């Protein structure tokens, strides 16, 4: 009897070893950059991050926590809302995340930060990514003044009219560091017909441009994701 029990336990153990692990999505933070921006009317800490699904199932960012610390390690600003631009990430896909917190004490300076992102398996939507072309135009003449813009040309390469197209654009330096993130959306009242293209234009705030100049950094390119979320039946 004992031998039979041992044989059964051994068989169960071997079966457990042989069973493949359940597929799961997994978030990996590839890059996170902290920017402190102070103007006459605000003092904020911005966090720009790039996140990739390195698992083997669809996943979405379900929550996030961002906290900023001063030189003594004391928390000075926080945010618990992660603006994850692409709702559902397929295996190997990435998205950008923006979080920010207000520094209420004007004497404090952001010296360090913590970012925590949580993901969950997502089967409610299918995120369709659309081809896009980007262009960076610095000091573009607007008549009697100039502006700095990121341009994203999006093409609907499907055979149907698409509503609620979203775009996120990341401003990058020579090394690919994220300098700024901005987004735009057609919302549900406007659409892009099959085979057609349209241009999104997003302004780079002058306070960020002044910060790059002070740090000796130069924006050189734009990376963009254009997508539409399609609810599954």
Go through each PLM region and give its residues.
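Sec-dependent N-terminal signal peptides of Gram-positive bacterial secreted proteins and lipoproteins
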Residues: 3-23
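Short, solvent-exposed loop/turn segments enriched in Ser/Thr/Gly
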Residues: 41-48, 63, 144-151
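Short, structured motif recognition centered on aromatic/hydrophobic residues
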Residues: 59, 64-68, 162, 168-171
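Short aromatic-acidic-glycine turn motif
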Residues: 68-78, 171-182
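Intrinsically disordered, low-complexity Pro/Gly/Ser/Thr-rich segments with frequent PxxP/GP/PP motifs
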Residues: 76-106, 181-210
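Terminal connector regions
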Residues: 102-146, 205-233
């Amino acid at each position: 009897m004992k031998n039979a029990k041992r044989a059964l336990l051994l068989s169960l153990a071997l079966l457990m070893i042989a069973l493949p692990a359940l597929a799961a999505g997994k978030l990996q933070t590839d890059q996170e950059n902290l920017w402190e921006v102070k103007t006459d009317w605000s003092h904020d800490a911005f966090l720009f991050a790039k996140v990739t699904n390195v698992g083997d199932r669809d996943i979405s960012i379900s929550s996030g926590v961002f906290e900023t610390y001063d030189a003594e390690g004391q928390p000075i600003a926080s945010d618990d809302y992660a603006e994850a631009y692409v709702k559902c990430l397929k295996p190997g896909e990435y998205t950008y995340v923006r979080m920010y917190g207000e520094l209420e004490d004007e004497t404090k300076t952001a010296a360090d930060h913590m970012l925590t992102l949580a993901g969950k398996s997502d089967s409610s939507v299918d995120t369709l990514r659309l081809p896009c072309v980007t262009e960076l135009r610095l000091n573009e003449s607007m008549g009697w003044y100039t502006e700095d813009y990121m341009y994203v040309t999006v093409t609907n390469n499907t055979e149907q009219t698409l509503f609620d197209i979203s775009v996120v654009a990341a401003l990058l330096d020579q090394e690919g560091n994220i300098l700024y993130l901005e987004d735009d959306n057609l919302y549900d009242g406007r659409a892009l017909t099959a085979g057609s293209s349209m241009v999104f234009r997003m302004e780079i705030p002058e306070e960020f441009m002044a910060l790059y100049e002070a740090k000796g950094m130069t924006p050189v390119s734009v990376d963009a994701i254009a997508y539409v979320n399609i609810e599954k039946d």
